[in-house]
Swiss-Prot record:
Subunit structure: F-type ATPases have 2 components, F(1) - the catalytic core - and F(0) - the membrane proton channel. F(1) has five subunits: alpha(3), beta(3), gamma(1), delta(1), epsilon(1). F(0) has three main subunits: a(1), b(2) and c(10-14). The alpha and beta chains form an alternating ring which encloses part of the gamma chain. F(1) is attached to F(0) by a central stalk formed by the gamma and epsilon chains, while a peripheral stalk is formed by the delta and b chains.
Example GO molecular function: proton-transporting ATP synthase activity, rotational mechanism
Alphabetically ordered keywords of this record: ATP synthesis, Cell inner membrane, Cell membrane, CF(1), Hydrogen ion transport, Ion transport, Membrane, Transport
Organism name: Sulfurihydrogenibium sp. (strain YO3AOP1)
Pfam families given in the database record: OSCP
Gene that specifies this protein: atpH
Protein name (database record): ATP synthase subunit delta
UniProt family annotation: Belongs to the ATPase delta chain family.
Cellular localization per UniProt: Cell inner membrane
Function of the protein: F(1)F(0) ATP synthase produces ATP from ADP in the presence of a proton or sodium gradient. F-type ATPases consist of two structural domains, F(1) containing the extramembraneous catalytic core and F(0) containing the membrane proton channel, linked together by a central stalk and a peripheral stalk. During catalysis, ATP synthesis in the catalytic domain of F(1) is coupled via a rotary mechanism of the central stalk subunits to proton translocation.
HAMAP family membership: ATP_synth_delta_bact
InterPro entries: ATP_synth_OSCP/delta_N_sf, ATPase_OSCP/dsu
């Protein structure tokens, strides 16, 4: 089933428009959308009910109301999420959280980043990398740090579309590629 991108943006923009734009509130909505995503992907009963064209709309609404009530979702956002089911677009629950996070990042001028290093990175080095990358791309970056011994040395830094690969592993691959041309 194909997902309608225009509908995605419309729903996300409506959610953002009808909510308090505090970081705390937007993070709460993001976590609710994460839970709906997980529920949609992992709970076959939930998925079958909201996607089944033969299930009554009343049953679908009751299910959504119970789930959203249990999650503590306010009335305005609940109406929007129930409208998704009424519009027969429930398949967007599996991706809605990603689009919402992207729009929230745009709203706050932040970018998710990742540092994959061959060794443990201390806080001072992380802050130094963060300040350099933020000055390069002009946005605030929230990094997740991972260790990967297969890099041998160095690191791979990703922030939005900005990628720096200084790992020994990639250097050796480039060297191998260059030498194999001769």
């Amino acid at each position: 089933m194909k997902i309608d991108k225009k509908y995605f943006r419309k729903v996300v923009n409506e959610i953002i428009a009808k909510t308090d734009k505090s970081e705390e509130n937007l993070l709460k909505i993001s976590s609710i959308l994460d839970i709906l995503n997980k529920l949609f992907k992992e709970n076959q009963t939930f998925r079958n009910i909201v996607l089944n064209p033969k299930a009554s709309m009343e049953d679908k609404e009751k299910l959504m109301e119970k789930v959203l009530s249990a999650l503590g979702v306010d009335a305005e956002i609940s109406k929007l999420l129930i409208k998704i089911v009424k519009d027969k677009k429930a398949n967007i629950f599996k991706e809605l959280n990603k689009v919402f996070k992207f729009e929230v990042e745009k709203f706050f001028g932040t970018v998710q980043g990742e540092i994959i290093s061959a060794y443990k990175i201390d806080e001072a080095l992380l802050n130094e990398i963060k300040s350099v990358i933020e000055s390069k791309i002009g946005k605030k970056v929230e990094f997740t740090v991972k260790e990967d011994n297969s890099l041998i040395g160095g690191a791979v830094i990703k922030a939005g579309t900005y990628i720096i690969d200084t790992s020994v592993k990639s250097y050796l691959k480039r060297l191998e590629s260059t030498l194999s041309r001769f």
